[in-house]
Amino acid sequence: MESQKKFARTFSFEFFPPNTPEGAEKLAQTAKQLAQLKPKFFSVTYGAGGSTRERTLRAVLDLRSAGYAAAPHISCVGSSRNDIRDILKEYQTHGIRHVVALRGDLPSGTAASGEFQYANELVAFIRSEFGSQFHIDVAAYPEYHPQARSAQDDLLSFKRKVEAGANSAITQYFYNTDCYFHFVDECEAMGLSLPIVPGIMPIGRFSQLARFSDACGAEIPRWIRKKLEGYGDDTASIRAFGLDVVTRLCDDLLAAGAPGLHFYTMNQAGLTTTIWQRLGL
């Protein structure tokens, strides 16, 4: 963890692009609430196969017009070089200089296509086309990507993204600090030096969390899963327990030298704000 201690702490919040006017209004209110915590930026996700391209752009521009720093996600699978070039030029026109570069997923039932296969190819393309004009975040997987052939293959995949020109990384969420510490140590052993910011998923609804975790390969430790299952439909108890677990997780990460936190907010301000207040940030 020594390499992470030298980086300034950054805090950020992630949104998904709304698909209704009501959702857009709700996101505006959520952003206004979370902006009071003075994050470095808000990020906005990008749907499978670029399915939310226009909505992601609109959400990012709305955040910018409200005076907030925004970083759009860009996924490359299913896209051509011209597609990516056009997207980045559009963001550049609007003064956006920070992107989160991902491989991404194709919509269910769709065959692989496009001119990119891996995220490192996207990072390399951005650098070749735009030089250092964009700050590039990439994804990191302390518990390893669910499609990785092995732990070593996944580490090498991350290394290629860094060597292609990534500035920093945001991890998939996790609830076991040891996996993050071990991942950072392995990155240090490979000579990688960049901020690796832990991704944090507040716990609000167990069914939703279980579904997300099964899909993305994030492990819910057995003791946490059993406690949450035991609460059944008792939402208040789930939230109270989740706040305790995630606050402790964040506290331990920051105490060990993590260079900030990136919250997956699900377009909700409440849980993230409460965790923030409990941490005394």
Put a short name on every predicted segment.
Residues 14, 42, 91, 161, ...:
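Conserved, mostly hydrophobic/aromatic
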Residues 10-26, 48, 70-82, 135-153, ...:
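Active-site mouth loops of central-metabolism enzymes
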Residues 41-52, 74-76, 100-102, 167-176, ...:
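Catalytic beta/alpha-barrel core
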Residues 32-45, 163:
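Catalytic domains of carbohydrate-active enzymes, especially glycoside hydrolases
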Residues 2, 22-25, 50-62, 80-87, ...:
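Active-site-adjacent beta->alpha loops and helix N-cap segments on the catalytic face
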Residues 1-13, 20-21, 25, 225-226, ...:
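N-terminal amphipathic alpha-helix/helix-capping segment at the start of soluble metabolic enzymes
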Residues 22, 114-141, 190-243, 248, ...:
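Active-site pocket-lining/capping segments in soluble small-molecule metabolic enzymes
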Residues 21-34, 56, 81-89, 150-160, ...:
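Short, acidic/polar
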